[in-house]
A protein has these predicted regions:
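Active-site-flanking segments in enzyme catalytic domains
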Residues: 3-168
């Protein structure tokens, strides 16, 4: 396995920053590592930009090796928004799609709304890098229908990690 560290950020054509990539079940690339400052540690920033990304990309490596239950793809089928995960249109124009907006639709992050593979790995990354209090708050804020969808997805994620990789 290879960790490839790139000093500067990468960007999509939409202008969104790319935090990391996973390739061929073997290589994880993390971008913007020159932004790390060991003299001024910011735990929230480390979690959001690096730890979540490492777990997210590692989860891609796992499913590139052994795919997850295809029933996961059907839970939010028709609700994935592709590159539009970053914003949504209202009568007032484009609005940023925040995580709390995504929660009520049954996604753990706005980025999870882009496609089912991202949805799957975001469940892993968010669960591993956040406290139980964060998860409980997310589920409460998601409302009854959003929480039910997240729970359904997470059950598949949990079973995949336990049954496929022996990780509980």
């Amino acid at each position: 396995k290879t960790f490839h560290l790139i000093g500067s950020p990468a960007y999509e054509s939409s202008g969104n920053m790319v935090l990391g990539t996973a390739e061929g079940g073997k290589k994880i690339t993390l971008y913007n590592v020159n932004d790390l400052n060991i003299k001024k540690i910011n735990i929230e920033k480390l979690n959001e930009y690096y730890f979540e990304t490492m777990h997210h990309e590692f989860a891609h490596i796992l499913h590139q090796k052994r795919n997850f239950d295809p029933s996961f793809n059907r839970i939010s089928e028709g609700k994935y928004v592709g590159a539009d995960w970053y914003y949504y249109m209202t009568a007032q124009g484009a609005m940023p799609r925040t995580d709390d907006v995504a929660w009520s639709d049954g996604f753990v992050t706005a980025y999870a709304m882009s496609q089912s593979n991202e949805d799957f790995v975001e469940n892993i990354a968010m669960y591993v890098t956040h406290t139980q209090a964060y998860w409980d708050n997310m589920m409460t804020a998601a409302g009854e229908s959003g929480a039910a969808i997240i729970n359904k997805k997470f059950t598949i994620v949990y079973n995949y990690m336990r049954d496929t990789w022996g990780i509980d």
